[in-house]
């Protein structure tokens, strides 16, 4: 056992995960720029590239915040990684179908609103206030779940097996 509470251990893991999600957004940007040069696309410009860097890094962080409740819940149970992965995938997949006002409310698509994602379309309007509130609510739920006390697991009494003494020598 570790001489640290589960809550502190979880908080440390969540902080490291937040930093990693931001960093992986930067890594995604780097791969995008490298792919741009490998494919030989024209029109690379520094200002849009820097805007893309900021957007991709923040998108990684905001998506982490939207998934925070799922991460906290699945961290409480042994062997629940796959369940958390499936739930997070479905949660993100449903976000592709959000449009209109729902687009600013649904947390996964609200992350796109906070980075001002346009998908190449003109006239895309995001309600940034709703986007911010949506992600803030998910973050608050995740933090609140961290402080909810976990039910103690029922432990079965270990039965000791007595071996019969060997006969003979």
How would you name each of these model-derived features?
Residues 1-6:
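Short helix-to-coil transition segments within interhelical loops
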Residues 85-166:
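Terminal transmembrane helical anchor/hairpin motif
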Residues 29, 33-45, 79-83, 100, ...:
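Transmembrane helix-loop junctions in multipass membrane proteins, especially transporters and channels
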Residues 65-96:
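Functionally important transmembrane alpha-helices
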């Amino acid at each position: 056992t570790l001489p640290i509470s589960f809550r502190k251990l979880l908080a440390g893991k969540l902080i490291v995960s937040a930093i990693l999600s931001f960093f992986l957004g930067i890594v995604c940007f780097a791969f995008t720029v490298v792919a741009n040069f490998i494919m030989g696309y024209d029109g690379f410009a520094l200002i849009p590239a820097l805007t893309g860097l900021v957007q991709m890094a923040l998108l990684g962080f905001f998506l982490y915040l939207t998934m925070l409740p799922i991460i906290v819940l699945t961290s409480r149970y042994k062997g629940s990684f796959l369940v958390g992965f499936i739930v997070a995938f479905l949660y993100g997949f449903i976000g592709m179908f959000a449009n209109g006002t729902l687009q600013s409310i649904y947390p996964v698509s609200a992350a796109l609103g906070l980075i001002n994602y346009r998908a190449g379309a003109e006239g895309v309007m995001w309600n940034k206030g709703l986007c911010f509130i949506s992600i803030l609510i998910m973050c608050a739920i995740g933090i609140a779940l961290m402080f909810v006390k976990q039910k103690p697991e029922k432990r079965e009494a270990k039965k000791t097996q007595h071996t019969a003494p060997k006969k003979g020598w």
